Amino acid sequence: MELPAMALQSELKQDKFPSSDVPVKDKTKKITWVRVWNSTDIFHIILVGGLHVLCLSAPFTFSWSAFWLSLTLYAVCGVFGTTLSYHRNLTHRSFKLPKYLEYFFAYVGLHALQGDPVWWVSTHRYHHKFTDTYLDPHSPIEGFWFSHIFWLFDSKYILEECGRYENAGDLLKQSYYRFLERTFVFHVYLQAALLYMFGGFPFIVWGMAVRTVWGFHASWLVNSVCHRYGHQAWDTGDLSTNNWFIAMLTSGEGWHNNHHAFEYSARHGIEWWQIDTTWYVIKLLEYLGLATDVKVPSEVHKRKMSFKNCVQDKQFCVNDK
């Protein structure tokens, strides 16, 4: 099954990655390491690099208490923080929460150490606006490793190509999110101090480094792998794919072609067999009366986005809209 015809693909050869539905040609971004690095890039490389180095101590600091702490924080910060709060609630407004609960989950997300809510939401909205083009903050056509991690260390690229936080005005209007943006580093230190106080160095290694690095790469695999390897179920006009393995790692985020087809949907695992842990949590919150205005795709929208509504024209599938 080929991808829809679009301006981007007219520039790309139709070679496919192994075990992938996605035709794409890399245009590897030449990252200039010898350059003037701004404070954001320096902070990112110190934080990400430092946490990876700390992980080397994991075998020597193992304890069951540290292990279970790591697993618990990974699940809580990943599901309630990154995927439920940052992604589906704040970025896409897929459902509504009482303000106190929205703020609480956003603070939980802060401790996944993937950035403050304003930065995360702004970057992800630019990703959807410019998906798989040269303006995409972590475009796969700039090379696998750029889309996976190196984009984090080139904030000038995002500023020049996309802009700053103009697309996150709904968050910037709220003093709470401006506060988290200004004080993000403080919360990183606070987390480290509390973990050390309660469990010493092993809690730092397992409760902060191991579970955070695991969370980093799980999220980054959505950016890199899920725009290269997997299956396309919907005519999204981009390179997004569904990848069941990444979905298992990320509480449902790996159903990425579904997500790009229905960005507003709180449910990413559209089919009954597509496990989506984050969606189950949202449904529980809805049952408890805490989540309202929960959005899911209509049957009409599904038919519109289906490849069955396309007319096959040689190598391309053109929307009949």
From Swiss-Prot:
Keywords in alphabetical order: Fatty acid biosynthesis, Fatty acid metabolism, Iron, Lipid biosynthesis, Lipid metabolism, Membrane, Metal-binding, Oxidoreductase, Transmembrane, Transmembrane helix
UniProt short sequence motif Histidine box-3, positions renumbered to this chain: 256-260
Any one Gene Ontology molecular-function term assigned to this protein's record: metal ion binding
UniProt motif Histidine box-1: location: 87-92
Domain of life: Eukaryota
Binding site for Fe cation 1: H87, H92, H124, H128, H259
Keyword Magnesium: no
Residue ranges of the motif Histidine box-2: 124-128
Residues annotated as binding Fe cation 2: H127, H227, H256, H260
Subcellular localization, as worded in the UniProt entry: Membrane
Pfam families per record: FA_desaturase
Family statement drawn from the similarity comment of this UniProt entry: Belongs to the fatty acid desaturase type 1 family.
Functional description taken from the UniProt entry: Catalyzes the desaturation of 20:2Delta(11,14) and 20:3Delta(11,14,17) to generate sciadonic acid (20:3Delta(5,11,14)) and juniperonic acid (20:4Delta(5,11,14,17)). The enzyme can also use 16:0 and 18:0 as substrates.
Protein name: Acyl-CoA 5-desaturase AL21
UniProt source species: Anemone leveillei
Taxon lineage: Eukaryota, Viridiplantae, Streptophyta, Embryophyta, Tracheophyta
